[in-house]
Design a protein with these regions (language model features):
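Glycine-rich, basic loop-to-helix element that forms the pyrophosphate-binding segment
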Residues: 69-84
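Cell-envelope/extracellular polymer assembly enzymes that use nucleotide-activated donors
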Residues: 3-5, 34
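Conserved donor-nucleotide/metal-binding helix-loop-beta segment in metal-dependent transferases, i.e.
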Residues: 102-123
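Acidic donor-binding segment of Leloir-type glycosyltransferases
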Residues: 25-65
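Short beta-strand-to-loop element that shapes/binds the nucleotide-sugar donor at the catalytic cleft/hinge
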Residues: 121-137
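Short, well-formed alpha-helical segments that are part of the catalytic scaffolds
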Residues: 13-27
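C-terminal catalytic/acceptor-binding lobe
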Residues: 19, 164-241
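Short beta-strand-to-loop acidic/aromatic patch adjacent to the donor-nucleotide binding site
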Residues: 88-98
Length: 241
């Protein structure tokens, strides 16, 4: 059994965080070695509320929760949380997603085990990719499952698109060694973006370009497992540093 640590980044949105964790608890079917949450709100009130809430949501896991005393930005928070990981795989998660189908980690392993240059597998629906194009050719992988012993996974590779190789901080499985190949993320980002950028897309693009230069790519399943629920409650990214 390949060990997986969940790393979840949050920023004070406890209502969305609760929905995210509850849906993960309901639909995840793979054993989790550790569950790490790092909150970057810098808000003591949020920290006090989370201290009361999270032990119940995470009672089934060996869990660790960290609060930044003042905001550091998502990227520094990710680098810190990843530095605490001692498992070969990370399931990255943010605080504004809702899962609705099972076996997303097992199915991701089926693809990643067969392709060492697959940086991650997207779990969104095909019509929910922010217009990121995919290859027309589809691929099939059979897998055993109790309810579907002859089931087939259909997926597509994502095309390189305006510098994007497919890397994203959206929910998804990734190898710890692939992170360590370029770690920390902050060294690949312009200084103006490291603390608290106005657009996280710029950060993802810079990291995606780096992985693309190393030959990595991403894939997406024909059927999705998760939806974004945070559009109307986006974190206001203003530095307090």
């Amino acid at each position: 059994m390949k060990e997986v640590t969940v790393v979840l980044t949050s920023c004070g949105r406890l209502n969305l965080l609760t929905k995210t964790i509850r849906s993960f608890n309901k639909f995840n079917t793979y054993p989790i070695s550790k569950f790490i949450i790092i909150d970057d709100s810098g808000d003591l009130t949020i920290h006090e509320e989370a201290d009361k809430l999270l032990p119940f949501l995470l009672e089934d896991y060996d869990h660790f929760v960290f609060f930044n005393n003042k905001r550091k930005g998502q990227l520094k928070s990710i680098d810190y949380a990843y530095s605490l990981v001692d498992t070969p795989y990370i399931f990255h998660l943010e605080d504004d997603w809702e899962f609705y189908r099972t076996s997303f980690i097992e199915h991701s392993f089926k693809l990643m085990d067969n392709d060492p240059k697959l940086i991650t597998v997207w779990l969104r629906e095909l019509n929910d990719t922010m217009n990121h194009p995919r290859y027309k050719e589809s691929n099939f992988v059979t897998y055993p499952a109790e309810d579907e012993p002859l089931a087939i996974l259909k997926y597509y590779y994502l095309k390189e698109y305006k510098g994007w190789s497919g890397f994203s901080f959206n929910p998804g499985l990734r190898r710890h060694r692939d992170y360590k190949t370029i770690s920390p993320f902050t060294k690949h980002i312009p200084d103006k973006l490291v603390n608290i950028p106005e657009s996280l897309l710029e950060i993802e693009l810079a990291i995606s370009k780096k992985y693309g230069d190393l030959g990595f790519k991403a894939a997406i399943f024909e059927k999705g497992y998760v939806r974004h629920i945070g559009w109307e409650n986006t974190t206001k990214l203003k530095s307090t540093i």
